[in-house]
Amino acid sequence: MVEAPNSPSAQGPAPLVPPASVYTVAVRALCEFTAKRGDLDLRFTPSPTGAEGVEGHGVVTARRGVGYQTEVALSGDWGPLRVRGRADGWDPVARRLEEIKTYRGDLAHQPNNHRQLHWAQARVYGALICRQLGLQQVALALVYYNIDTRQETVFSETGEAAALQAFFEEQCWRFAAWSAQETAHRAARD
């Protein structure tokens, strides 16, 4: 296999300063940084309030079967980077990880960069859960819950552990490369 010179596996982990420390980043923050495409405004208006979002998550998870787990803590390391977060939902029987998003209005009007961000989050969580549980593949689902109509719209895909791990490493490499550059810039400035 020939690797591109700028790929994470060809370059190895980008150094963070200081190299002995661990830099912790949330899954959402990692993906917001690495998965941005197009317009940087990630608002989809009119958006639900924080309380409505929490309530919507509760409605969706209450609809799931026995054994369904919510707010599943996941973490994984890549070089000096520790990525962690809480997956919205996990069905261990179906091996299905859900990323739940609340919205109002017409989902067809949601900007594409939002969906890319949401898939990035689901795929990073998918990589982490495959690693944690030793799975070869996992079902991933974006569950969009309309606050006003109380309806769910679900988009699904199957993620192979190796592909999800490669995606995870790519996001980490991008973030770590930026972080090293930012640290060097701040050191030179100060």
Place the predicted regions along the sequence by residue.
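Metal-dependent nuclease catalytic cores that hydrolyze phosphodiester bonds in DNA/RNA
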Residues: 1-95, 120
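Short, solvent-exposed loop/turn segments that connect beta-strands within catalytic domains
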Residues: 78-80, 110, 133-134, 150
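Short acidic (Asp/Glu) and glycine-rich catalytic loops that position anionic groups and cofactors
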Residues: 35-41, 102-104, 148
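ATP-dependent helicase/translocase motor core
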Residues: 102, 134-190
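Charge-dense, low-complexity intrinsically disordered segments
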Residues: 47, 112, 158, 162
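Metal-dependent nuclease catalytic cores in nucleic-acid-processing enzymes
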Residues: 58-64, 113-142
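Conserved catalytic cores of phosphodiester-cleaving nucleases, focusing on short active-site segments
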Residues: 85-111, 125
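Short beta-strand segments enriched in hydrophobic/aromatic residues
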Residues: 74, 129, 144-146
